[in-house]
Regions:
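Beta-rich, blade/repeat-based domains predominating
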Residues: 164-168, 252-254, 327-332
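Beta-rich carbohydrate-recognition and catalytic domains
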Residues: 1-31, 35, 39-96, 105-160, ...
Length: 357
């Protein structure tokens, strides 16, 4: 990436309000509802899959049907919990969680593909599950990144978050059509082994976490859906470039196809982080966008140099983690695109994605 990349992104985000807040007296939500995935059930009804945080920062994935006022998402009706940290690898001695789901409907597979962060014995690890109806999920297991000698490291050593799949096959580095996923490795192993510090892959000189892409050939997934957990051909897509994202960046909702290419809404973080796994941070999370080349989605062809949305409202500026706008889902409703986002790790908001030119 270079700052010579065009910075014009012909879209803007317009706030439409809060759609979900913690339900008083609900034990699974006492520390917040946030960072939702989304999808439609077979009958076409729109649902969110919010991260529900119980006491002790234990997260589950819920299901909530979206309600509307004058055609605009305005609330939800809860439908229960659809994924909990029930597996041993999703729980540690003093922690547990299935966190920050992203869900992509993949028509060629006839399935919703959920990525989530399993907060287990060795910290955060990405994992996958699939469903045909948003209610019944089948775990595919933790993601196992294929060894790539030219990186001079094993991606499985590192915490990894913000995994999200493209909704259709894209060209891989070898020209073969593949199911691709974006992800965000974090190179500092000091959280696991004090003093170990940062271990960068070969060719990477910036230790700030950025967005990567990995691929699985279509033929392998058609033979066995579990192949999605074994991505390879890892490539760096983007690193922090601008002041509003000076600490790190990460992918948001599944990329959507627009005239210019693949539109990726992402988050950027500025401020200071003393403990990467502490809830209270002196940081600001904002939403931006980039456009990826449809012929090679590892290439960024345009990128916003200013955030499309930064924390401004009370709900975005005050919460479990203050000053957070964290986009994680995007859906079309009556020809309009709405982005759902976490607000200060406490509430869920919605914004209209509008074309500006």
């Amino acid at each position: 990436m270079s700052t010579t990349t065009p910075t014009h992104i012909p879209f803007r985000l317009v706030r439409k309000g809060v759609v979900m807040s913690p339900l008083p007296g609900e034990s699974t939500e006492v520390e917040g509802v946030l960072n939702p995935a989304s999808g439609r059930t077979p009958d076409g009804r729109l649902h969110l899959l919010p991260r529900l945080v119980a006491d002790g920062n234990v997260s589950r994935v819920g299901l909530a049907e979206v309600t509307f006022t004058d055609g605009v998402p305005s609330g939800v009706e809860r439908r229960g919990v659809v994924l909990a940290p029930d597996e041993g690898w999703e729980r540690g001695k003093n922690n547990a969680g299935v966190e920050d789901p992203r869900v992509t409907w993949v028509p060629s597979l006839g399935k919703h593909v959920m990525s989530y962060v399993a907060y287990g014995p060795l910290g955060p690890k990405p994992a996958l599950a699939v469903s045909e109806n948003l209610t019944d999920w089948t775990r595919l297991g933790p993601i196992q990144f294929a060894y790539q000698p030219d990186l001079d490291t094993d991606l499985n050593l590192f915490p990894n978050k913000d995994v999200v799949h493209f909704p259709e096959p894209v060209p891989g580095p070898d020209g073969e059509m593949a199911y691709a996923m974006l992800h965000r490795p974090m190179w500092d192993l000091g959280w696991f082994r004090p003093g170990e510090g940062v271990h960068l892959p070969a060719g990477v000189t910036d230790e700030r976490p950025g967005i990567w892409i990995s691929y699985v050939p279509v033929a392998e997934v058609e033979q066995d859906i579990r192949a999605l957990t074994r991505p390879r051909q890892h490539r760096l897509v983007a690193l922090s470039e601008y002041p509003w994202e000076s600490l790190k960046i990460g992918g948001g909702p599944a990329p959507i196809r627009v005239d210019e290419g693949w539109l990726l809404i992402h988050h950027g973080v500025s401020g200071s982080i003393e403990d990467p796994f502490a809830q209270n941070q002196k940081v600001s999370y904002a939403a931006g966008a980039m456009i990826l080349d449809p012929a090679d989605p590892s290439q960024v062809i345009a990128r916003s140099d200013q955030p499309l949305m930064a924390p401004e409202t009370d709900e975005e500026r005050s919460g479990t983690v203050p000053n957070v706008v964290f986009p994680t889902a995007i859906e079309e409703v009556d020809g309009k695109l709405y982005v759902f986002y976490g607000m200060a790790d406490a509430h869920i908001g919605v914004a209209l994605l509008e074309r500006t030119s």
